[in-house]
């Protein structure tokens, strides 16, 4: 491939044109054209692929326009955007701006009890990221299509609060944690420990407060609705219908959002969602509030269970660990998997749905960047890192000589891969 700058610019520009043309054609075919692009997972495959290619080509073109000085300028901008969004979340601006119509900066500042000039500065920076818009007479602010979605979806609100209240403060202690505990793998020697001045693991910290437990569970549910983490990728990564009416044990399944998605797509499967008792109590209530069809809810049950204890459900078709093991160091990950082994039936499988780190530059940068971001985020919270395929194979080999990773698949547009483990 020709790596000259002119050739790369030409290649990515052509990709932008081709992808945008296909997406535009799809939008014009719709009865009601949306104000924002639909999720990549909710459109025809060809359109979804075009959205992925458009994002990657635009990302690369943008970076070609930046010299080193502009790179530093953009990093400064990114930091201030994050700070502004955190400020807006903290003072509940997203919920105070009406979903329909507009409100004056003066009235909004009064209701939020913040200085009007600061409010205007924070909102106008957010506007450059398509959050909020000025509408009607001068001095009036309204939701943009994007900020309206963020404000009206409770799970996204929870995710935003979790980002503002937990992720951001933790990231600021990244350097301090490495300086204090270089090379440490202890669960209680992390940036999160420094940010919140506690001495247990992150999960100890969360479990000590029911409100934290609910906020974390809801934020994980929200993450699963984004296209990169959408549960539909899991639905397409294996022939679930081949399991018939088998039982899927959704370990650490939180609100049961993954099991619900699978139950809606595969009407014969049955599910046991396991998590800590406090999480289970809240999840049962949430499931009832959703008023899903009985054909779905009657196939899902919840069970209080700790990952580190022996698996009580015997002979299930699948033991699913989706975004679970990456939170644990190798020793505990091995222990969690070993707790499943005595429960395995002759045809049981263990599914790990997690990031498998690629070789640098081997996948689209827009996808790799999210993986690398999660890699560091994990370290800041739990002192773990995302794993390569070789890392996963090493863990499985420590669990049992009779277990093998038989299949690895990453659905296009997904950040997570599915690793299928079977007894040999």
Swiss-Prot record:
Pathway: Secondary metabolite biosynthesis. Pfam families: Methyltransf_2. Keywords: Methyltransferase, S-adenosyl-L-methionine, Transferase. The active site is at residue 326. One of its GO terms (molecular function) is O-methyltransferase activity. InterPro entries: COMT-like (IPR016461), O_MeTrfase_dom (IPR001077), SAM-dependent_MTases_sf (IPR029063), WH_DNA-bd_sf (IPR036390). PROSITE patterns: SAM_OMT_II (PS51683). Belongs to the class I-like SAM-binding methyltransferase superfamily. Cation-independent O-methyltransferase family. This is O-methyltransferase aunD. Its EC number is 2.1.1.-. PANTHER family: MONODICTYPHENONE CLUSTER TRANSCRIPTIONAL COACTIVATOR MDPA, PUTATIVE (AFU_ORTHOLOGUE AFUA_4G14580)-RELATED. O-methyltransferase; part of the gene cluster that mediates the biosynthesis of aurasperone B, a dimeric gamma-naphthopyrone. The first step in the biosynthesis of aurasperone B is the production of gamma-naphthopyrone precursor YWA1 by the non-reducing polyketide synthase albA, via condensation of one acetyl-CoA starter unit with 6 malonyl-CoA units. Disruption phenotype: Leads to the accumulatio of aurasperone B and fonsecin B. GO terms for biological process: methylation; secondary metabolite biosynthetic process. S-adenosyl-L-methionine binds at residue 275.
